[in-house]
C-alpha cells in the first residue's frame, strides 16, 4: 500500500487554520474528492455534517466550494453526531458523507472524515485516490455553467436521525437520567431521544459556543457528572464525547461503567457467539464472558482494528473501554446515543441495574512498566524475552495475562501484567521488565 500523506486512521486531523486544515487546502480536498466521485457516476451527492467547533463553519464552506466546483451536489445537515451523518448518507442514497469533527480533542483541533455510500469509512484505495488527486487539482479541466454543483440545507436531518434512534430505544418511563452532552454534536439529539423514550432527563453541557466542546466535560471528564448523580436522586448518568460516537455511564452511586461493562451486558442479552475488543480490555471481562460461554477476541488498540476483526469473522458486537461500542447488525459505525439506548435495553431485558453490573465485573489489578530500550522492534522478537513472557503466563495459569508492546512514539517497551493478585502481578512485571531492560542493552 502507498504511504499516506494526509489521511490518518480517522481522516485528516490538525489544528484548524494550520496546514493541512487551511481554507485553501480543504477547498482542494473537496475538489479532489469530487473528481474521484465523478469517476463513478455523474452528479454525485455528498452529505456534510459537523460538530460545534467554531472552525467547522470555515472548513464546511471550503469543502463545499471544492466539491461543487467539480459538479457535486452538497447536502448540509448541520450539527449532528458523526453516526448521524453516516446514517443520513445511507438514508438519502448519497455517494459519500463527510464529518467535520475532531471527536474528543480540544476545540482548536478539527478533522475531516469521509464515509462511503454504505456509511462506513472510505476504503484505503479511495482515500489514496483522493490524496493523489489533490496534487492534480490545478490541472483539472474547468467545470462551468449548469455542470457546477449546488448546495442544499437539509432541515429534516435531525428529525430523521432521532426517528432512527427511537426505533431502538426501550421504554425509559420512570428512569431519572443525568446526561453530559460535552457541548458537542449530541447537545440536542441526546436529550430529545431519551425524553421521547420516557426518561426524566437532566442534561448539562448543552450550550455550545464554538470553544467549549469537551472542555472539562464529556466522556473524558466524568467528574461533574459523577457528582451530579451522587448528589441528586438519579438512577444513572450518561456522557457522550464531542462527536457522540461513544458513550460512558455512571451508576446511581457515581461509579464509572465503561466499555468492558457494556460489552458484557450486551453480549449476555444478545447471546453473541463471540465479542471483539482490544488488548487493553480487562481480563475480568474475558473471565465473565468465558463463564457465559462467549469467546473474546482481542485486537491492537484502536476501534478500526475492532471493526476490521468483526468484519473478518462475521461478528457484530465489539468495542473498547472508552465507550466506543459497535453493533454492526444495527449500524455500521460507533454511535454513542445508540450504544446508550441498546445498553439500557439489555439492562431491562436481563432485569439488572448498572449498579449490579459494576459490582459484578470487578476489574483485575493491572500494572504497567515502561522500559527504555535501544531497539524496540528487536526486543519484541527476542527469544529470551519471549521465553520470559511464556514463563510469566505459565505462572498466572490462565488467571491473568501478560502483554508486551512497543510504544508508538518512543523507544519504550510497555510491560503490562494483569491478574487477581496485585502483589503477584507487580512481582511478575518487575521480573519481566528486568529481562527486557537487560536484553535491551545488548544487540538482539
Curated annotation (Swiss-Prot):
Q: What is its EC number?
A: 5.4.2.10
SUPFAM superfamilies documented for this protein? Phosphoglucomutase, C-terminal domain, Phosphoglucomutase, first 3 domains
Record's Gene Ontology CC terms? cytosol
- Has keyword Metal-binding? yes
Q: Which residues carry this modification: Phosphoserine?
A: 103
Q: Enumerate the catalysed reactions.
A: alpha-D-glucosamine 1-phosphate = D-glucosamine 6-phosphate
Q: Which cofactor does it need?
A: Mg(2+)
Task: Identify which residues the record assigns to the active site.
Answer: 103
Which CDD domains does this entry report, sorted A to Z?
A: GlmM
- The protein's superkingdom reads Bacteria
Q: Which stretches are annotated as coiled coil?
A: none
Q: Name one GO molecular function term.
A: phosphomannomutase activity
Sorted alphabetically, the keyword list is: Isomerase, Magnesium, Metal-binding, Phosphoprotein
Please state what the protein is called: Phosphoglucosamine mutase
Species per Swiss-Prot/TrEMBL record: Deinococcus geothermalis (strain DSM 11300 / CIP 105573 / AG-3a)
Q: Which gene encodes it?
A: glmM
